[in-house]
A protein has these predicted regions:
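Membrane-embedded alpha-helical segments and adjacent helix-loop junctions characteristic
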Residues: 94-181, 339-409, 413
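Helix-loop-helix connectors at the membrane interface of multi-pass transporters/channels
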Residues: 169-175, 210-213, 402-408, 440-452
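Hydrophobic transmembrane alpha-helices of multi-pass small-molecule transporters
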Residues: 24, 28, 42-118, 224-361, ...
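Transmembrane helix-bundle signature of multi-pass membrane transporters/permeases
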Residues: 147-150, 168, 185-195, 223-229, ...
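Alpha-helical transmembrane segments and, especially, the helix-loop junctions at the ends
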Residues: 153-163, 180-218, 236-240, 383-399, ...
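Membrane-interface alpha-helices at helix entry/exit sites of multi-pass transporters
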Residues: 139-144, 174-186, 216-226, 409-418, ...
Length: 484
């Protein structure tokens, strides 16, 4: 598609789809139609056979089931469910704006926008070319490019990582006349693995940071101990060792190829600047700024948005406003932003109805008084569920549940939070449908004429994932486990 002109996306449909569900959602919260909200509360009161908590749970269950059955309509479903939570009085109208975690929304939007310009600069392709040129054979190319994809994914969205690295693998495979299937699968599962390594690595990491008030450096060192970043690196090395032996027979020689030309270095410098600023903000006490509401609470989001806007403004001088806007909007995942906005309100509804407290009590009852048993249950249950359902709604739901469990048990929730994140992030690697990055990678292979069976995918993904989860499971408990 050409940039600019008549072929540019219609902004209304880009942001809200067709029909414009986002507009319908926000207009539904406009104070004028108060009779509608009174009507909704009257309906709830009329359902005398169903206590409020059960009604909220029913809305949540239908929402979750619909999101699983209709994955392309997850955002629409979440927004409609959010409207129902308000309509039935579970979330007061005046609290809707405050229930949305704007730090998470701004962090995702800012990072996505900047990363899109970074990808468009061709810098990732250039870096991948350099790695490939140094490798002796296909086996080492696969290992190296999976490690490279993992490194990129620690700071860039998983799907974006696959979109920027997988085409390089496919080109190399065609040039050397071998199947790129193993290489692209390795890129996809390595990208998912590293998503939990840093605050900006994945939506679930951003959500955890927003919920638990973690800063960028807390993922590197927390409570004076090695953080998730280092734990994930050890898990990555262990899984890569398996990958090396799995690929051992792929010893075809690799020839040098021409390096991709970088067309713009500015987005790369701005991405580095954003990461450096996030590191600095982790150590500094951020003051409140008048024109930035809740500055201290939303520091991460403001930093990401400021760097994205500055990069956008500079790029408009080089490419023109319309072309730059097209680049950013073409890959800005408005779907996820609307999905999260709706989920924040839905979760507030079930929290206010008392559902989360009851679920936390149920987990506490099953896990007893043993923190280790509870941690084990959370990790492996998260691995299982995330293999079949999207981890974003799962983590969004479980974060307040984990907080409730820790409160009931009277323990520090850190080990449970980290266990939830690692299990939910890594569990998506088990199946081809468990993570968006997997679906993206398989789609790219299919488009290139390569079919991938579930058996072939899982012959790589299951051992790779279980090794990573087991290493992470043991190390998280070793550093943060509660003993005695």
């Amino acid at each position: 598609m050409k940039r600019g002109g008549k072929e540019s996306p219609i902004l209304l449909e880009k942001f809200f789809g067709s029909p414009p569900w986002g507009i319908i959602f926000f207009v539904s919260f406009f104070p004028a139609p108060m009779k509608v909200f009174r009507f909704g509360r009257n309906i709830r009161k009329g359902l005398i056979f169903m206590p409020p908590m059960y009604l909220a749970l029913l809305i949540f269950a239908i929402t979750y089931g619909t999101m699983i059955a209709l994955p392309n309509y997850r955002a629409h479903t979440a927004l409609l469910a959010a409207a129902l939570m308000v309509l039935f009085g579970f979330v007061p109208l005046g609290q809707v704006f405050h229930e949305i975690n704007w730090n998470v929304i701004m962090t995702i939007a800012g990072t996505m926008g900047l990363v899109t310009l970074f990808i468009d600069s061709m810098m990732p392709a250039r870096l991948a070319d350099r790695i490939i040129d140094k490798m002796p054979d296909v086996k080492w190319v696969t290992v190296a490019i999976s490690l490279f994809a993992g490194l990129i994914s620690a700071f860039v969205d998983n799907v974006s990582t696959v979109l920027m690295v997988a085409p390089i693998a496919i080109v190399v495979a065609k040039k050397l006349d071998f199947s790129p299937v193993k290489m692209v699968i390795a890129i996809s599962i390595a990208s998912n693995l590293q998503g939990a390594a840093t605050l900006v690595g994945d939506t679930t990491s951003i959500m955890l940071a927003g919920h638990a008030n973690l800063n960028f450096m807390d993922f590197f060192f927390f409570q004076g101990k090695p953080g998730l970043f280092w734990i994930i690196q050890v898990a990555m090395l262990a899984s890569t060792l398996f990958l090396y032996f799995y690929m051992k027979k792929d010893d075809k020689r690799v020839e040098a190829r021409n390096l991709t030309k970088v067309n713009d270095y500015f987005p790369s410098w701005m991405l580095l600047g954003m990461v450096f600023s996030l590191v600095l903000a982790s150590f500094a006490e951020v003051p409140e700024i008048i024109f930035l509401p809740n500055t201290a609470k939303n520091t991460t989001g403001y930093i990401c948005m400021i760097f994205m806007v500055l990069t956008f403004l500079i790029e408009t001088r080089k490419k023109g406003f319309q072309d730059t806007l097209h680049i950013v909007l073409s890959d800005l995942d408005v779907f996820t932003l609307l999905l999260l906005s709706g989920l924040f309100i839905v979760i507030a509804g079930i929290r206010n109805a008392g559902v989360i407290d009851q679920v936390a009590k149920l987990f506490t009852k099953v896990g007893g008084k043993s923190p280790f048993l509870m941690y084990t249950l959370l990790v492996w249950a998260s691995v299982f569920f995330s293999a079949f359902i999207d981890n974003i709604p799962y983590v969004a739901t479980m974060l307040p549940v984990v907080a409730g469990i820790a409160g009931n048990m009277g323990i520090d929730p850190t080990v449970l939070y980290f266990g939830l994140l690692s299990g939910a992030t890594l569990g998506g690697n088990l199946t081809p449908i468990g993570a968006s990055a997997n679906i993206t990678g398989i789609g790219m292979l299919r488009k290139g004429g390569y079919e991938v069976s579930n058996r072939r995918f899982m012959s790589m993904s299951i051992p790779y994932t279980l090794i990573a989860v087991l290493v992470g499971y043991l190390l998280i408990w070793h550093f943060f486990g509660i003993r005695g």
